[in-house]
Design a protein with these regions (language model features):
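Active-site phosphate/pyrophosphate- and oxyanion-stabilizing loops and adjacent acidic/basic residues
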Residues: 168
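Flexible, glycine/small-residue-enriched loop-and-beta-strand segment within the central core
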Residues: 2-5, 18-156, 184, 191-192
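Conserved beta-strand-loop-alpha-helix hinge in the C-terminal portion
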Residues: 176-199
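C-terminal substrate-recognition "lid" of short-chain dehydrogenase/reductases
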Residues: 156-158, 174
Length: 200
């Protein structure tokens, strides 16, 4: 293991894992970082980088060029799409699907059975560069659906079973089992056709 660079998960092709030779599994960001733990059934495609000090459950799948940074915990049966960035110190539950070009900043929490559409952007800094502040990403509770090109502002909570429509800019909490639409997002009743848990 080099002080800053490549390390490797033990026996990367064992335990029914498929890891492309152009993927980096175990990027050592400090001299004493620990190689990642990845469960059975993983498929990690070319260009993906997974840092040390990451814990991932079974049946993990990436697209091409995904990034998972340090101190991230990911549950079972999770998809991280092509060019999606998970910027570390983040907790993601099980049965989660993140599509292409999603950005997840540090200090974000994602529950179980959550869908995140392409090019969704989560944020954790309310005053970029201009003020010093604690970074706080959004919290997505269980069974949340996030549409394409949604922006979630720092520290907001999207409640259980809520649905955020494509293109919405969410500046405040979204109550459970509601629909958020528009810029800035307005809260509306959730249509019956969209109610119920996600089957991911």
């Amino acid at each position: 293991v080099s002080p800053l660079g490549w390390s490797a998960v033990t026996e990367p092709q064992s335990r029914d894992r498929t890891i492309h030779p152009d993927a980096t599994v175990g990027y050592a960001y400090t001299a004493d970082s620990t190689p990642p733990t990845i469960g059975d059934g993983a498929t990690i495609r070319s260009g993906t980088v997974i840092y040390d000090d990451v814990t991932i459950g079974s049946d993990f799948t990436t697209g091409h060029g995904a990034l998972v940074r340090e101190k991230t915990t990911i549950g079972d049966d999770v998809i991280v799409g092509t060019n999606t960035v998970i910027d570390g110190q983040t907790t993601i539950g099980s049965h989660v699907s993140m599509q292409t070009n999603v950005y997840v900043p540090t200090n974000t929490t994602v529950g179980n059975r959550v869908f995140v559409g392409p090019a969704a952007t989560f944020t954790n800094d309310p005053y970029p560069i201009r003020q010093s502040t604690d970074l706080e990403g959004p919290t997505l509770e269980d069974d949340v659906s996030i549409g394409a090109n949604v922006t979630l502002l720092p520290g907001i909570t999207v409640g259980e079973g809520a649905f955020v429509a494509a293109g919405a800019v969410v500046t405040d909490d979204v109550p459970p089992e509601t629909l958020a639409v528009g810029t800035p997002a307005e809260i509306r009743p959730l249509p019956e056709s969209l109610s119920g848990g996600n089957d991911i």
